């Protein structure tokens, strides 16, 4: 499931719910999304019934994150500065949320390190391709939309069925999520690197 490939189909949904957002500057929307991500990270760390509010925070952060680009295009305020701010805040949001999972009593700092670096490398490879003249690379199994969906699903699992068992590692919904992000993150980063490198190598030969 690669939800980033469905972005063009989301335009109708954004049109339907986006009118109230058109009066808000796009950069402000980006900052609001980031603030919800920070709050969600703290709530995830706290655990317990706070996870319900963490789920809502992730949902709101995702909504505002989708809206900033939509509003920028609709109001003619799209800019490189806004895009740069949006991507910077997205990475900080990723760190804040995954840090909440990592330092949670149900998480793992060690798995969290690899999950965070895997996610950051995934995003870096996507935008680095664009910086050298290619299209932004969304290839792979762990785009940002996918990550946010997985996060919300595993928060629900932790609320409903908070299992905990050991087999070399301590497995909880949170550690399984971090392990998946670590593995899928590096696989996605490698996939994006390989596809971009091949395309660049082909340009040099032509």
Q: In which residue ranges do the predicted regions lie?
A:
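Hydrophobic alpha-helical transmembrane segments
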Residues: 1-62, 97-206
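Conserved G/P- and acidic residue-centered "switch" motifs that form tight phosphate/ATP-binding loops
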Residues: 65, 86, 119
């Amino acid at each position: 499931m690669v939800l980033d490939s469905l972005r063009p189909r989301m335009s109708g949904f954004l049109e339907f719910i986006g009118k109230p957002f058109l009066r808000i500057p796009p950069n402000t929307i980006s900052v609001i999304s980031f603030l919800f991500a920070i709050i969600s990270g703290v709530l995830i760390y706290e655990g317990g019934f706070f996870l319900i509010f963490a789920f809502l925070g992730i949902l709101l952060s995702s909504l505002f994150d989708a809206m900033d680009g939509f509003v920028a295009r609709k109001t003619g305020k799209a800019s490189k500065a806004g895009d740069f701010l949006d991507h910077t805040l997205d990475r900080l949001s990723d760190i804040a949320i995954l840090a909440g999972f990592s330092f949670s009593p149900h998480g793992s700092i060690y798995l969290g390190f690899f999950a965070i670096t895997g996610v950051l490398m995934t995003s870096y490879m996507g935008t680095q391709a664009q910086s050298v003249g290619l299209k932004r690379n969304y290839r792979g199994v762990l785009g940002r939309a996918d990550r946010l969906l997985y996060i919300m699903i595993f928060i629900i699992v932790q609320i409903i069925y908070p299992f905990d068992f050991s087999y070399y590692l301590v497995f909880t919904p949170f550690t399984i999520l971090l392990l998946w992000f670590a593995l899928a993150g590096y696989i996605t980063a490698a996939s994006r690197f390989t596809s971009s490198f091949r395309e660049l190598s082909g340009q040099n030969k032509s």
